[in-house]
Every structure is written in C-alpha cells, then in structure tokens.
UniProtKB/Swiss-Prot annotation:
InterPro entries: aa-tRNA-synth_II/BPL/LPL (IPR045864), HisRS-like_core (IPR041715), HisRS/HisZ (IPR004516), HisZ (IPR004517). Belongs to the class-II aminoacyl-tRNA synthetase family. HisZ subfamily. GO terms for molecular function: histidine-tRNA ligase activity. Pathway: Amino-acid biosynthesis; L-histidine biosynthesis; L-histidine from 5-phospho-alpha-D-ribose 1-diphosphate: step 1/9. It comes from Prochlorococcus marinus (strain SARG / CCMP1375 / SS120). This is ATP phosphoribosyltransferase regulatory subunit. Keywords: Amino-acid biosynthesis, Cytoplasm, Histidine biosynthesis. The keyword Amino-acid biosynthesis applies. One of its GO terms (cellular component) is cytoplasm.
C-alpha cells in the first residue's frame, strides 16, 4: 500500500488544520462586517462553467467520470458568477458575496505527468457595480483583511496592480500576426526576444520602454502618458491610487503598477491585482483578483449588462507565513482529567461533562495513574494547560 499522499498534496497535522480554521474564521468575520453574505458554490461543475469561457485551460481542470462533462473547481469565481446571473438574478444589486472552500488544480510536472493540487481558498465577489468604486472597495477590503490577519511589514507585502486596457493600448497598432507573440514577450518581461522583433522601429522602442516601466504608480503613469499621451484610463487609475495609497502605507504595503502584468487565469477584462509576501524561500502570492464583467455576462440571460469583480486569498499560503503573532487570541485552556486507581473512569467522565458545560476543553486520560506526579508528567508531555486530579 502507498504510504504517501498523492503528489501535489499533503496531510495536515492538527495545528495546521486549526490554523486554517482560524484564518478562515477571521476572514469570514471581516467579510461580514463589510456586508458580504456567504454562499456555497458546488465543488463539482460542468466543464463549460469551469473553463470560464476559455479563461481557464481545460488541462488545469480535474475531470470526473460521468455521463455529463464535469470536473472539480480550480477556482470559485466562475461558479459564483454563474449563480449570481441565474439563481440570484432576482436580487437587488450590488450583490456582496463571500465564500470559502477547497479548490483542485490539475498540473503538469517536469516529467510530463499530470498531478492534482488541492488548496483552500477564501474570497469575495462584488456583483453589479460598473465603475471604479467596486475596485476601490475591494482593494480597501483586501488591505483591511491583510491587516486583521496581522500580516506585517516583515513579510514585505507588495500589492501588484495592472489593467487589461493598458495592455490593449500597448498592443494597439500591432498587426494580428505579431500580437499574440508580442503579448507573450511583454508578460514574460522578455527584453531579448522583444529587441529581436522584426517590426516598425518606433513601435519596438515603445515596447522596450514599457518593459522597463514598473513600480511607483504615479511615476509609471507619468511615463505612460509620455509614451501614449493622455488617457481617461490613466486619470481613473490616478484617482484609485490617490484613495488607496494612504491606507496601504498605513498597513506597510508597497503598491506597484505593472503595465504588462497578466494573471495566470485569463478571467479578467479590467483591473487586475495580486498581493505578494516574502518568505524565507521565495515570494508567495497570497491573494489575487480583478474585474470580470465578460465572465459574468457569459452566464446572464438578461439584456442588461452585468458586472463583477472580486478577489480570493490562499489560506494555505497565509498559513505558511511567519506571522507576527499566532492566531491564538481566543485560545481555550486545555485540561487533562486524570484519576487514581481508587477512582472509576465514570468519575472522570462526569467531571469532563461538567467542564464541557462551562464551554471549556477537557480530555480524560483513559488509564488510571499511579500518582499525581505521573499525571502532571502527562500534562507537560501532551501540551495541556492544567490538570484535574481525581483521587
């Protein structure tokens, strides 16, 4: 029999499970304070939904054997967009929804074999707000959540922001024969391949300039204006950064604008962002999101355009951070109940029920102890806080 879990997955010990629960619980409390309501999308969906109109590769979906083409969700955004446009279509907008659950991704390893990765995700979706107010609320909520999780400047958090319309502007004027190739070079920050392009020298020089532009939002926007001229989008982004930069500085988060940033899943058609934290080994993306109007409209039967935006946290990656404080602010005292050979096991059970009725945690040592000293040794060995000795 195999003694290891499937490649790409791991067994979680009780401390890891508890930490996942506490992170998820804290996030859900934050979402609800902001007026978001919980929904629970299914783990199993039709492949047509899971691929999110081509935004998610078919290869990344774990497929199930059934009469209908179905699979396990690699992300929850498409499922919520579907529910918002169908079962929740009658509800007043804006819809503020949050969810938490397991996602499954199929991934090709270095040997060309497909493995399944399982993860825990928690996030929010804001449906029905078409202007930049939606992104501002979501970014404020993202930063507030990060602060409440006590992710501090020690993790060097960076909020990386891009916009699909900036990339479209950069690619405008380029023939369709080259567009996909150039987009790949830009999103991969490939200066060498870009320099070797056989295209108009003026366009190439603009592309090379853009590849070197990222960092402080105000500086990046100034440089983009110098290259492409004034643009309503640039004005809207200036307003957004003017609002969110004070709160980001307060929480120790650095904001970077990257004109060529593209997320892995191609779900988004507007603002896109991800929150990155530094670990001992490498940077980790702990949250990502953006606007996905096209996705939510693909599910609607209404003649009116629908809009949507949201983000999600990776609970597993947050758990792996070396946080400033542990999530034990509501730690319950652990009590061990031990009894001598002159007492009955039932006596210990009665005492356990009495402690439980007070809302506290208590466990019974199933075998009698010879002495109280032996019971005290078990308390220390097993990490209990106190002993109830019945003799």
């Amino acid at each position: 029999m195999p003694i290891q879990p499937a490649f790409g997955n791991k067994d979680l010990n009780p401390q890891e499970v508890r930490k996942n629960q506490l992170i998820s619980s804290r996030l859900s409390s934050i979402y609800e304070r902001w007026g978001y309501e919980e929904v629970s999308p299914p783990k199993v969906e039709r492949l047509e939904t899971l691929t999110a109109c081509g935004g998610i590769s078919n290869k990344e979906i774990v497929k199930l054997v059934a009469d209908d083409p179905i699979g396990l969700r690699p992300d929850m955004t498409a499922s919520i967009a579907r529910a918002a446009s169908t079962r929740l279509a009658y509800k007043d907008r804006p819809l503020r929804l949050w969810t938490s659950g397991t996602i499954f991704k199929s991934k090709e390893d270095c040997d060309g074999k497909f493995v399944i990765e399982e993860g825990l995700q928690s996030g929010v979706e804001l449906i029905g707000i078409s202007d930049m107010a939606a992104e501002i609320e979501l970014l404020y909520l993202l930063l507030d959540s990060m602060n409440q999780l006590e992710i501090c400047s020690n993790q060097n958090p960076i909020l990386l922001i891009g916009h699909q319309s900036i990339l479209k502007l950069i690619l405008s004027g380029i023939s369709n024969d080259y567009k996909n190739k150039i987009q790949k070079y830009l999103t991969n920050y490939d200066l060498v391949e870009t320099e070797d392009l056989d295209i108009d020298i003026e366009i190439k020089n603009k592309l090379l300039k853009v590849l070197k532009i990222r960092g402080n939002p105000s500086d990046v926007l100034d440089k983009l204006v110098n290259i492409y001229g004034s643009n309503t989008l640039f004005d809207e982004l200036r307003r957004l950064f003017l609002i969110i930069e004070p709160i980001s500085k307060k929480y120790g988060v650095s904001i970077q604008l990257d004109p060529t940033y593209q997320p892995h899943f191609k779900l988004y058609n507007g603002l896109i962002f991800q929150l990155i934290c530094q670990t001992d080994y490498a940077p980790k993306v702990i949250a990502r999101g953006g606007r996905y109007d096209d996705l939510v409209n693909s599910f609607t039967t209404s003649i009116e355009n629908e809009t949507g935006a949201g983000f999600s946290f990776s609970i597993d990656k947050i758990r792996e951070l070396k946080l400033k404080v542990e999530y034990d602010d509501k730690k319950v005292a652990r009590t061990l109940i031990a009894f001598s050979k002159s007492k009955r096991y039932e006596d210990a059970l009665e005492k356990q029920l009495e402690i439980h009725r007070k809302g506290s945690m208590a466990m019974v040592e199933l075998k009698p102890c010879d002495t109280k000293k032996e019971a005290e040794f078990l308390v220390n060995k097993r990490g209990f806080d106190k002993l109830v000795w019945i003799s």
